[in-house]
Curated annotation (Swiss-Prot):
HAMAP family per record: 16SrRNA_methyltr_A
Residues annotated as binding S-adenosyl-L-methionine: 18, 20, 45, 66, 91, 112
Signal sequence bounds: none
InterPro entries hit by this protein: KsgA/Erm (IPR001737), rRNA_Ade_diMease-like_C (IPR023165), rRNA_Ade_Mease_Trfase_CS (IPR020596), rRNA_Ade_methylase_Trfase_N (IPR020598), rRNA_adenine_dimethylase (IPR011530), SAM-dependent_MTases_sf (IPR029063)
Role: Specifically dimethylates two adjacent adenosines (A1518 and A1519) in the loop of a conserved hairpin near the 3'-end of 16S rRNA in the 30S particle. May play a critical role in biogenesis of 30S subunits.
GO cellular component, one term: cytosol
Membership in a protein family: Belongs to the class I-like SAM-binding methyltransferase superfamily. rRNA adenine N(6)-methyltransferase family. RsmA subfamily.
Native organism: Shewanella pealeana (strain ATCC 700345 / ANG-SQ1)
One GO MF term: 16S rRNA (adenine(1518)-N(6)/adenine(1519)-N(6))-dimethyltransferase activity
Keyword tags: Cytoplasm, Methyltransferase, RNA-binding, rRNA processing, S-adenosyl-L-methionine, Transferase
Listed EC numbers: 2.1.1.182
Catalytic activity of the protein: adenosine(1518)/adenosine(1519) in 16S rRNA + 4 S-adenosyl-L-methionine = N(6)-dimethyladenosine(1518)/N(6)-dimethyladenosine(1519) in 16S rRNA + 4 S-adenosyl-L-homocysteine + 4 H(+)
Domain of life: Bacteria
Protein name: Ribosomal RNA small subunit methyltransferase A
Length: 267
């Protein structure tokens, strides 16, 4: 049998499918997720239910968002899960997670995310951060390193700034390729993202912050003065106390927020 086939389902490259099969890793991830009935439990991309089954076993209801119609049909017929699942067939990148919000419950979101959409999906989820208690995702190890990076490192970039603006970022464990069917060509890791209830550095316009960081990191080797000349003058940098000759990866999240707020106040 092909190593792309697991439990009778062939992994689809266009959906970025790699199915988690290592029981020890699965148990450690479920322990980190800590399923309970006090939160709205949401899984993105349940696949062949490697995480779905153990998470659902200890709770009353689990909401899943799955794009693959064949996998949705399998879940609907699952002998154990079918009565516990609320299934939404569709693209998580376009899904309105506000429809899952309950007045008295925050969401816990988790999933083994397709690596080809993981970054845009996290940006999408940040829009619902005020309704989320925490998120646990299996990602490409490189992405977890970017999420948790410190200023002055190669991994530090736009994703780092936006993730750390919205959330505390904590790597949980590393997962080698052999834990999946088929094995991905890269190492994986699990990360915990905990949205801030109160932002340490409140931004007056998050869209402006996103655009400013995108512009700053478009040319990583050039200085802030060069990259942000359409937004900030030398006088602005002096007022902010930021050295305009620094490169974008040398600037902290707090400083990016200060720059965005300065541009906003000048409007």
């Amino acid at each position: 049998m092909s190593n792309k086939v697991h439990l009778g389902h062939t992994a689809r490259k266009r959906f970025g499918q790699n199915f988690l099969t290592d029981e020890n890793v699965i148990n450690r991830i479920v322990g980190a997720i800590s399923p309970d009935n006090d939160h709205v439990m949401v899984e993105i991309g349940p696949g062949l239910a490697a995480l779905t089954e153990p998470v659902a076993s200890g709770i009353d209801k689990l909401i899943v968002v799955e794009l693959d119609k064949d996998l949705v049909e399998r879940l609907k017929e699952h002998p154990v899960l079918k009565d516990k699942l609320e299934i939404h067939q569709g693209d998580a990148l376009k899904f309105d997670f506000n429809q899952l919000v309950r007045e008295d419950k925050q969401m816990k979101v988790f999933g083994n995310l397709p690596y080809n959409i993981s970054t845009p999906l996290m940006f999408h989820l940040f829009e619902f951060a005020q309704h989320i208690e925490n998120m646990h995702f299996m990602l490409q190890k490189e992405v977890v390193l970017r999420l948790s990076a410190s200023p002055g490192t190669k991994a530090y970039g736009r994703l780092t700034v936006m993730a750390q603006y919205h959330c505390q970022v904590m790597p949980v464990l590393e997962v080698p390729p052999g834990c999946f069917t088929p094995p991905p060509k890269v190492d994986s890791a699990v990360v915990r993202l905990v949205p801030y209830k109160v932002k340490p550095w409140p931004c007056k316009d998050v869209d402006l912050l996103r655009n400013l960081t995108t512009t700053a990191f478009n040319m990583r080797r050039k200085t802030l003065r060069n990259n942000l000349k359409q937004l900030l003058s030398d006088e602005d940098f002096a007022v902010l106390g930021i050295d305009a000759t620094l490169r974008p990866e040398q600037i902290s999240v707090e400083q990016y927020v200060a720059m965005a707020n300065h541009v906003f106040d000048r409007k």
